[in-house]
Amino acid sequence: MTMREEIEAAAARYPDRRSAIMPALMIAQKEHGHLPGPVLEEVAQILGVERVWVYELATFYTLFHTEPIGRFHLQLCDNVSCMLCGSEALLTHLETTLGIRKGETTPDGAFTLSTVECLGACEMAPVMQVGDDYHGNLDAARLDALLESFRAAERVTSVERAAAAPGE
């Protein structure tokens, strides 16, 4: 199914097509990896809504990305509960370990580091979201283990891609 068909199918579930902007953005981001201007315009055109409505949602919610992000998007909560449990020190640790600052992506494109206002998981503070998964009760050692597991997954994926490459 094409992106247009998926968006049309999602929009059919709503009485007002404006209500379908969020699911349409999710579909478009899954297809393109992020939501640059032309993709936002395409979503608005498919839904028949004002571009500003699409742009407002795409730039308000932290789950949408208008710029490319790394294969692993590390979103560290920096709200009160997580701060009280050490998220500031964990942010510094991640910046030092990865050699990037908040808002940046590693040169190899593997990791993007962000902070988010609240992940709604205060019971396991400090917490970080990576993709759809939450990782809680974090400390520097757990972060290092997580980063290594992500790097190991990257190595496996790279080997699989190389093995699947035609003519090699």
Curated annotation (Swiss-Prot):
The record's free-text note on cofactor binding: Binds 1 [2Fe-2S] cluster.
Catalytic activity as recorded in UniProt: a quinone + NADH + 5 H(+)(in) = a quinol + NAD(+) + 4 H(+)(out)
Pfam family, one: 2Fe-2S_thioredx
Keywords: 2Fe-2S, Iron, Iron-sulfur, Metal-binding, NAD, Plasmid, Quinone, Translocase, Ubiquinone
InterPro entries given in the database record: NuoE-like, NuoE_dom, NuoE_N, Thioredoxin-like_sf
Primary role: NDH-1 shuttles electrons from NADH, via FMN and iron-sulfur (Fe-S) centers, to quinones in the respiratory chain. The immediate electron acceptor for the enzyme in this species is believed to be ubiquinone. Couples the redox reaction to proton translocation (for every two electrons transferred, four hydrogen ions are translocated across the cytoplasmic membrane), and thus conserves the redox energy in a proton gradient.
Family classification: Belongs to the complex I 24 kDa subunit family.
The name this protein goes by in its record: NADH-quinone oxidoreductase subunit E 2
Gene source species: Rhizobium meliloti (strain 1021)
Taxonomic classification: Bacteria, Pseudomonadati, Pseudomonadota, Alphaproteobacteria, Hyphomicrobiales
